[in-house]
Swiss-Prot record:
Converts 2C-methyl-D-erythritol 2,4-cyclodiphosphate (ME-2,4cPP) into 1-hydroxy-2-methyl-2-(E)-butenyl 4-diphosphate. Belongs to the IspG family. SUPFAM superfamilies: Enolase C-terminal domain-like (SSF51604), Nitrite and sulphite reductase 4Fe-4S domain-like (SSF56014). GO terms for molecular function: 4 iron, 4 sulfur cluster binding; 4-hydroxy-3-methylbut-2-en-1-yl diphosphate synthase activity (ferredoxin); 4-hydroxy-3-methylbut-2-enyl-diphosphate synthase activity (flavodoxin); iron ion binding. This is 4-hydroxy-3-methylbut-2-en-1-yl diphosphate synthase (flavodoxin).
């Protein structure tokens, strides 16, 4: 097997649609984020959603806590292209209202929106409009009786909570849903998802909730989601960070990219640097990451500071640079080229080569489609 292929065999699951994005089945694992603006501030919320679209978010969730927020949601929905999930708790009327306004998915827990009549109203509405539901179980808001039964959040408690909500939807013959069982503790979340994956065929929405700030939260999410994804568990994911939501999307794609599950944009392979480096690897990588954020074409680019590991990494890269005194070696598809890069102009030259390679690939695809 090529090192560029993922050996992971995904769990079989039912496919549902969130707007025009398939979730589950053979669909690519989608990356989500959530706005952190006041939903009633339409201008700020739309701006944030568009910034998430630009970095590749497949789906965006918006909290809708009030009827005023529901009215704002209507205006927001008209101004963005990405599918929107409405996050709703307690008031079933809000769910009915955003359904009128074209919501692409409802994030609710059927058991906390009222009596059976209210649940039926929401489920029937979702059926009529073909709107999927996400059951979102969270260790921080576990039902009181389950807290008393288990003493604390446990994998069995989260599983029981999830299946309780699943049973409610089953009673109404509603199958268009996905489920999450999130926790801030990696082991708790991972084991909860493992148990749930054995019990249902619906898609699973992965996340380590309240993971923390940008650095610690990214690490915690990478560990937890990496374990699950490597076992084939998971159909869509959201990285929860106390940071700019744009970072959540970037980290989500980086996790998928690291497991060769879904590649998007440039995968930079760069050495941590030492006294042997002949080029400023750190400055080069940082500059190119910023300059090439608009590139969506998957591509491996190695930037190694010296000839110890540089040639070997270049062999398995689309483009590679090996640092050398004044003029650095350049590799294309693992083959060393006669052309060399002036170290003083390395960033500009490598950016030009990458963009030329992207254009070449796009042209080839267009010709093949004729």
């Amino acid at each position: 097997m090529s090192i560029h292929q993922s050996p992971i065999k995904r769990r079989e699951s039912k496919k549902i649609w969130v707007g025009n994005v398939a979730v589950g089945g053979d669909a690519p694992i989608s990356v989500q984020s959530m706005t952190n603006t006041r939903t009633t501030d339409v201008e700020a919320t739309v701006a944030q959603i568009k910034s998430l679209e630009r970095v590749g978010a497949d789906i965006v969730r918006v909290s809708v806590p009030t009827m005023d927020a529901a009215e704002a949601f209507k205006v927001i929905k008209q101004q963005v292209n990405v599918p929107l999930v409405a996050d709703i708790h307690f008031d079933y009327r809000i769910a009915l209202k955003v359904a009128e306004y074209g919501v692409d998915c409802l994030r609710i827990n059927p058991g906390n929106i009222g009596n059976e009549e209210r649940i039926r109203a929401v489920v029937d509405c979702a059926k009529d409009k073909n709107i999927p539901i996400r059951i979102g179980v969270n260790a921080g808001s576990l039902e009181r009786d389950l807290q008393e039964k288990y003493g604390e959040p446990t994998p069995q408690a989260l599983l029981e909570s999830a299946l309780r909500h699943v049973d409610i939807l089953d009673r109404f013959n509603f199958e268009n849903f996905k489920v999450s069982v999130k926790a801030s503790d990696v082991f708790l979340a991972v084991e909860s998802y493992r148990l749930l994956a054995k019990q249902i065929v619906q898609p699973l929405h992965l996340g380590i909730t309240e993971a923390g700030g940008a650095r610690a939260g990214s690490v915690k999410s990478a560990v937890g989601l990496g374990l699950l994804l490597s076992e084939g568990i998971g159909d869509t994911l959201r990285i929860s960070l106390a940071a700019d939501p744009v970072e959540e999307v970037k980290v989500g794609f980086d996790i998928l990219k690291s497991l060769r599950i879904r590649s998007r944009g440039i995968n930079f392979i760069a050495c941590p640097t030492c006294s042997r480096q002949e080029i400023d690897v750190i400055a080069t990588v940082n500059a190119l990451e910023q300059r090439l954020e608009d590139i969506l074409t998957p591509m491996d680019v190695s930037i190694i500071g010296c000839v110890v590991n540089g040639p070997g990494e270049a062999l398995i890269s689309d483009l590679g640079v090996t640092g050398s005194n004044k003029m650095s070696g350049f590799y294309l598809d693992g083959v060393r080229q006669k052309e060399r890069f002036d170290n003083e102009k390395l960033i500009d030259q490598l950016e030009a080569k990458i963009r030329a390679r992207v254009a070449e690939q796009h042209n080839r695809i267009q010709i093949e489609q004729i």
